[in-house]
Curated annotation (Swiss-Prot):
Alphabetical UniProt keywords: Host mitochondrion, Hydrolase, Magnesium, Manganese, Metal-binding
Domain Nudix hydrolase: 45-227
Subunit structure: Interacts with the late transcription elongation factor VLTF-4/OPG110. Interacts with the late transcription factors VLTF-1.
Organism: Monkeypox virus
Sections of the chain in a coiled coil: none
Motif Nudix box: where in chain: 125-147
Cofactors named for this entry: Mg(2+); Mn(2+)
Signal peptide location: none
Molecular-function annotations in GO: metal ion binding; phosphatase activity
Subcellular location: Host mitochondrion
GO cellular component: host cell mitochondrion
InterPro entries for this protein: NUDIX_hydrolase-like_dom_sf, NUDIX_hydrolase_CS, NUDIX_hydrolase_dom, Vaccinia_D10_decapping, Vaccinia_D10_N
Membership in a protein family: Belongs to the Nudix hydrolase family.
The name this protein goes by in its record: mRNA-decapping protein OPG122
């Protein structure tokens, strides 16, 4: 794992008590360090995403299938043509079929790669807009990505989890704050109202009691942490996200 100087971890440690031991989970493209804290003082940071790990009424974990892979977004974003080509040729297995087809035409290259359709799973959330607090950010992102109104979402704000994500393919780091929550809908009801959009292709539902992969490991750590005593917290136990937005 490469060295990374977090933009907010020193402030988090200073004002929030550590709740659980840190863990590291990884796969072939990401290394994620997770640390849980009692929510005593948390604020929005313009460079840190806020995400929610949400359980449905039929006990499923809601995960989003990102439309564009992180690698594809990086290839499109970078202006360095050499870097574009290098990422495409070396890591095309980490693209989905449509992305490989688009980039093959763009570069007039046909890299030797498996004909797989890679899934990029993420939890709903994103970076707060200017002036947004945590509840407002979560409300907007969950509505935009999953089409769920905040009146159906309940967030446990007694604690939060700080994550440092190292993307070993594009060689970049990202920070995220996770909250645990519940949705007063079944997975089928969520699927019925979901509309594919420019960010999220479709939805995935995980079993919290069995599974594998990064998203399962993150959820397991979060749900295990939720069982701990959060002494000194300044949050709420599964408060309505709508009410949290109105209160703030």
């Amino acid at each position: 794992m490469s060295f990374y100087r977090s933009s907010i971890i020193s402030q988090i440690i200073k004002y929030n008590r550590r709740l659980a031991k840190s863990i590291i989970c990884e796969d072939d493209s990401q290394i994620i360090t997770l640390t849980a804290f009692v929510n005593q003082c948390l604020w929005c940071h313009k460079r840190v995403s806020v995400s929610a790990i949400l359980l449905t009424t039929d006990n499923k974990i809601l995960v989003c299938n990102r439309r564009d892979s992180f690698l594809y977004s990086e290839i499109i974003r970078t202006r360095n043509m050499y870097r574009k080509k290098r990422l495409f040729l070396n890591y095309s297995n980490y693209l989905n079929k449509q992305e490989r087809s688009i980039l093959s035409s763009f570069f007039s290259l046909d890299p030797a790669t498996a004909d797989n359709d890679r899934i990029n799973a993420i939890y709903p959330g994103g970076i707060p807009k200017r002036g947004e607090n945590v509840p407002e950010c979560l409300s907007r992102e969950i509505k935009e990505e999953v089409n769920i109104d905040n009146s159906f979402v309940f967030i446990d704000t007694r604690f939060f989890i700080h994550g440092i994500i190292e993307d070993t393919i594009i060689n970049k780091f990202f920070e995220v704050i996770f909250f645990v929550g519940r949705i007063s809908l079944t997975s089928d009801q969520i699927i019925d109202t979901f509309k594919s959009n420019h960010e999220i292709k479709d939805l995935i539902f995980l079993d919290p009691n069995s599974g594998n992969g990064l998203q399962y490991e993150i959820a397991k750590y979060a749900l295990d942490t939720a069982k701990l005593k959060c002494y000194g917290h300044r949050g709420c136990y599964y408060e309505s996200l709508k009410k949290l937005t109105e209160d703030d």
